[in-house]
Amino acid sequence: AFNSLFPMPNVTINCLNTATTFQVPGGSDLATAYQLSGLQLPNGVVSAKVNNKSEALSYRLYNDKQVEFLDITSGSGLRTYTRSLMFVLARAVEQLYPTARLRFAAILSRGVKCELTWPDADNAITEEMVSNLRIRMQQIIDSDLPFESGRCTTDNAIDMFRALGLEGKARLLESTGSLYTDYCRLGDSVNYFYGSLLQRTSQLKIYDLVKWEDGLLLRIPNPDAPTELMPLMEQPKTAEIFREHHRWQDIMGLTTVGDFNRACAEGRATEIINVAEALQAKKIAHIAEMIAHKPDCRIVLISGPSSSGKTTFSK
């Protein structure tokens, strides 16, 4: 009734995809704006950049904006697609193996490396389990469920995630200092993802789930060929680095950002630094020993991103 008495003015959209401007009713979401734009992305729209910030298609427009609609050929769009797949997998695990703990370990081997563990059983993953999860994922996708968002007080969100066994997310929220928290909902499954999700599960067309080393690999589309999966790539050295990193996290008792924030709040920052330095010194000594056992080695190359400590390491 309020909106009919006081209609919102139209919003002007500067669409970067078409280099044109058009208007939409104030309060429209990005999905509506995409329909009104007349744009037809060949691989379907998954999200958008609004004033250069990634947003879900449920984002509402109340002011004039610069908008670029994205599909899975863009990095941001592919991340939206991948997060949505992760949520579907999390729901499948919750339904089939409610006592299991699913951990998204790393982006590895052209997909998402996942760990599945049980509190009171061995962690052997069988092909039958993988097949069951794959079938359940497809059932969830075929159900065309909406990815919904909700908001509640952070205290309520902490209680909710803790009741669901999502202790890592609960600890993270305890350290944010935010009064309210946004969360994601898929059917009766609740979770928390940092970033946008798709509108509905039926948009997930290309994916696979395979047994990979001691865990699972959630395969995702290839942005260069969106109708195909990313080709599998063996990355043994990278995989070993991640395994070592997780071992170090277990040693220090810091498996999540929430654990780290809590430790810092408890005044353990110096202890954490000292333990990390000791582990790193041991690793450097091991590398030096490997080099010493190669008398014909003439040059050692050190690679890494900007400001990662290459010069300091070389000394």
Tell what function each PLM region has:
Residues 44, 59-79, 101-295:
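Auxiliary tRNA-acceptor-end handling modules of aminoacyl-tRNA synthetases
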Residues 309:
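Conserved glycine(s) of the Walker
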Residues 313:
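Hydrophobic positions on the alpha1 helix immediately C-terminal to the Walker A/P-loop
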